[in-house]
């Protein structure tokens, strides 16, 4: 059996640009991509914390150190400048490997400041 598992996550980044007329994709600071292990042109799912929209696109690299998160093309209708996003990539791996798999989770605060890197999502408690 093959399972689809969380591979990389950018948690609570802020949209810095939104360009309806760009040909598509989501431009992400190359440093952020590296931290989460997301490759340029890799499929990503985006979850907008502010409006509940969930959509899929692909990642393209923005200049390292720029802190850019630019939602482009048709997806620009799903996110406005200042919105808080969760950006995820997934990997398909055999069941045996899935049981010991650890994602790369990057937490952000403020104006796209990387806060910390983790290898798991915290257990939710009551």
Curated annotation (Swiss-Prot):
UniProt-annotated location(s): Cytoplasm
Primary localization: cytoplasm
Residue positions, PTM Pyruvic acid (Ser): 25
EC identifiers of the protein: 4.1.1.11
Top-level class of the enzyme under EC nomenclature: lyase
Alphabetized GO MF terms: aspartate 1-decarboxylase activity
GO biological process, any: pantothenate biosynthetic process
Entry keywords, A to Z: Autocatalytic cleavage, Cytoplasm, Decarboxylase, Lyase, Pantothenate biosynthesis, Pyruvate, Schiff base, Zymogen
InterPro entries in the cross-refs: Asp_de-COase-like_dom_sf, Asp_decarbox
Obligatory cofactor(s): pyruvate
Active site: 25 (schiff-base intermediate with substrate), 58 (proton donor)
Domain of life: Bacteria
Chain residues that bind substrate: 57, 73-75
Cofactor detail note: Binds 1 pyruvoyl group covalently per subunit.
Pathway assignment: Cofactor biosynthesis; (R)-pantothenate biosynthesis; beta-alanine from L-aspartate: step 1/1
Catalytic reactions on record: L-aspartate + H(+) = beta-alanine + CO2
A Pfam family annotated for this UniProt entry: Asp_decarbox
PTM info: Is synthesized initially as an inactive proenzyme, which is activated by self-cleavage at a specific serine bond to produce a beta-subunit with a hydroxyl group at its C-terminus and an alpha-subunit with a pyruvoyl group at its N-terminus.
Function recorded in the entry: Catalyzes the pyruvoyl-dependent decarboxylation of aspartate to produce beta-alanine.
Family (UniProt): Belongs to the PanD family.
Subunit architecture: Heterooctamer of four alpha and four beta subunits.
PANTHER family registered for this protein in UniProt: ASPARTATE 1-DECARBOXYLASE (PTHR21012:SF0)
Protein name, per record: Aspartate 1-decarboxylase
Source organism of this protein record: Edwardsiella ictaluri (strain 93-146)
């Amino acid at each position: 059996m093959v399972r689809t598992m969380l591979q990389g996550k950018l948690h609570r980044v802020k949209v810095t640009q939104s360009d309806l007329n760009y040909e598509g994709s989501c431009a992400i600071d190359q440093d952020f991509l590296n931290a989460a292990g997301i490759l340029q042109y890799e499929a990503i799912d985006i979850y907008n914390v502010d409006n509940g929209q969930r959509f899929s696109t692909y990642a393209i690299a923005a200049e390292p150190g720029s802190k850019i998160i630019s939602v482009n093309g048709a997806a620009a209708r799903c996110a406005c400048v200042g919105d808080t996003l969760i950006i995820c990539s997934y990997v398909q791996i055999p069941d045996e490997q899935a049981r010991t798999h650890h994602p790369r989770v990057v937490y952000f605060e403020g104006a796209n400041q990387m806060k910390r890197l983790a290898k798991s999502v915290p257990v939710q408690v009551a």
